[in-house]
Amino acid sequence: MGNFFCTENLTERRARFVYEGASLAAVAAEAPIVPAAWDEREEPFRQQFLKVIERQSDNHRSQSPEELHGSWMQAYFAMGWGYGEKYDRAAKVHPDLVPYVQLSQLERDKDAVFVALCEIARQWVY
């Protein structure tokens, strides 16, 4: 096997792992919203996602999908997003910008998968 040189730091590797894993889970679940590829995401999104992964990799990480969803909502509101019935990346509207209890079971499951992927990345991606 040839040499593999990765230019990403640890947080970037973990972020890509979690993001791509969550995207694959969304595809497998036939979710109505499947994220664009990591390299196609706008820089403010990637920067906030890296902060989420940093937080999820330390001792102050969110332990529950509900807690993580609340943090996700705060991050999206800070980036200028708002609630809308139909997802529109250009208009910055998202149907999941609602309290956790109002999410569908599919969206709750996606949040649980995200928490699990963060834990796998924290322990096993180096």
Which residues are covered by each model-predicted region?
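Alpha-helical propensity feature that highlights long, continuous alpha-helices across diverse contexts
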Residues: 1-126
